[in-house]
Amino acid sequence: MSRKPRVLSRPMAWRNAVNGVLQQLTGYQLRRGPVPAPRTAPQPDATKPSAAGRAAVKAPAVKPAAAKRAVVKPVAAKPPPQFPADYDDEAKDILRAVKPYTMTSPERLNAFVLATRHIVRHDIPGAVVECGVWRGGSMQACARTLLSLGEKDRDLYLFDTYEGMTPPTAEDLRRDGRSAQELLDAQGKDRPIWAVASLEDVKEGFAGVPYPEERVHYVRGKVEDTVPGQAPEQIAILRLDTDWYASTRHELEHLYGRLVSGGVLLIDDYGYWQGSRQAVDEFLERTGERLLLLRMDEGRIAVKP
């Protein structure tokens, strides 16, 4: 069977003619190849996580509970009170023991301890009198100091209403000028400014101090009603802490004369309540008493000539 001659299409014939000439001139020919697909940005593989996804996998979301645990910090225990370096160990122990029963600052408590040592060391006769005792912590400090010195026969007098503060007067302003009455009205009677403590509470606190009960005298009522009638004739330490002008003036007028020579006067609120300061300054001006009032933070201390 004879083959039929191959008939080329015109495009193919044209291409062959061109390739023949191109081959002779350059050694190259034109070849038809597959047309490449247009280049586009690679599409993400659905089976593989994206970069953001990988980041999410590497950093899982923090659970709310874990986040809360991460920011909660333990509350450190309240450190014990720090005392100046010159406070002796015995005084520090006394101050720590009475802390729950007093609002008196460490400096003023330490001054009371030193005053108590002073009257024992120098045989100063008389009782220890405190006007305004709150829960009795300051007088507890005195009693503990007496016990540490082996003295148990000195009378202790605690004058107080045992119902809280008495009404202030116009003279009674805080050091910043605010009225004491305004401050009292703004706070409930359970707040420290009212200084409410019952007689039973004070006695309960003293039960932990082995000082002879018959030597501890609780005098209940306003000092204007109980002083001088129920006060001792001789006083070795006179501590005034009733805050207000009228009560402080009354105490100085009726008790300072009973403070013996060499005895110690402690005024707790001289630098805090203007009425207390005014009462003291007026008394010293009126009597001409030459007292050097030494600062014990907001209080004052003096030894009677």
Predicted regions and their residues:
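Membrane-proximal basic amphipathic "stem/tether" segments
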Residues: 1-89
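S-adenosylmethionine/decaboxylated-SAM
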Residues: 80-106, 117, 122-305
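N-terminal pre-P-loop "Q-motif" helix
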Residues: 107-111
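Conserved pre-motif I regulatory segment
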Residues: 114
